[in-house]
């Protein structure tokens, strides 16, 4: 089992409500540098909401999120725009600007938000596009790309901001089955390179392959967590066992 020392992102007693509905009920979780944490659970368990809380896209009603052991999201003096630059996020819908080329979509945030030089960012963007086998699409428009290609562009766009941590929210859920693998392969490679990642997914085989740790959420709580192989081979709670059984088919 890999050893991880430095905590880079922490959730402390995080509570999230939508009106009377309590979605997250006091979540505690530490994410370590270089660790790949996969969050799984049934629809409506709170996993995607929790992920959005981890980079400040959702306000929380209790507890705190802490970056690098010192930057508290609850502290009003902290600029959430700067915090979000350290925590990249890729969504289920790629949200590329249709009127911009692929390259211009990638260059937009680093040049406008981070005020970096276009030449520097372009060099980085082209390297990343080559890495995900899309260098030849740099001058294409989103409508000319498949869903899998657009999702790989969305990953490159997030990486071009040089984040410390990457969050992935069910990024293959809207893709045709044959396009899923090309996106998951990019994420596997990022994991091998040591990127700190938190991934919400329904792809159980992928979760088992990529995760250092699996978090199983149920009804707004962490019901079970553990090393990936141990969790999938020998889940401790009845709820986790039932959940995993829904992915098993016997003739």
Regions found by a protein language model. Give the residues of each.
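ABC family nucleotide-binding domain
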Residues: 4-228
């Amino acid at each position: 089992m890999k050893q991880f020392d430095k905590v880079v992102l922490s959730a402390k007693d995080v509570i999230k409500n939508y009106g009377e509905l309590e979605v997250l009920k006091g979540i505690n979780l530490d994410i370590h540098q270089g660790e790949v944490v996969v969050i799984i659970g049934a629809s409506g368990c709170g996993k995607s909401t929790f992920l959005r809380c981890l980079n400040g896209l959702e306000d929380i009603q209790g507890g705190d999120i802490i970056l690098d052991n010192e930057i508290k999201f609850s502290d009003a003096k902290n600029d959430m725009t700067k915090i979000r630059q350290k925590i990249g996020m890729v969504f289920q819908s790629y949200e590329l600007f249709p009127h911009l080329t692929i390259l211009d979509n990638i260059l937009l945030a680093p040049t406008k938000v981070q005020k970096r030089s276009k030449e520097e960012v372009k060099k980085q963007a082209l390297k990343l596009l080559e890495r995900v086998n899309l260098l030849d699409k740099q001058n294409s428009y989103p409508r000319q790309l498949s869903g899998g290609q657009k999702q790989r562009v969305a990953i490159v766009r997030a990486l071009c901001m040089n984040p410390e941590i990457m969050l992935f929210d069910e990024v293959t859920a809207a893709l045709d089955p044959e396009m899923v693998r090309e996106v998951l392969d990019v994420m596997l490679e990022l994991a091998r390179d040591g990127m700190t990642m938190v991934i919400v997914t329904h792809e159980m085989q992928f979760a088992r392959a990529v995760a250092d740790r699996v978090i199983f959420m149920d009804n707004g709580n962490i019901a079970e967590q553990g090393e990936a192989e141990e969790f999938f081979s020998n889940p401790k709670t009845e709820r986790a066992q039932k959940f995993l059984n829904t992915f098993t088919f016997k003739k």
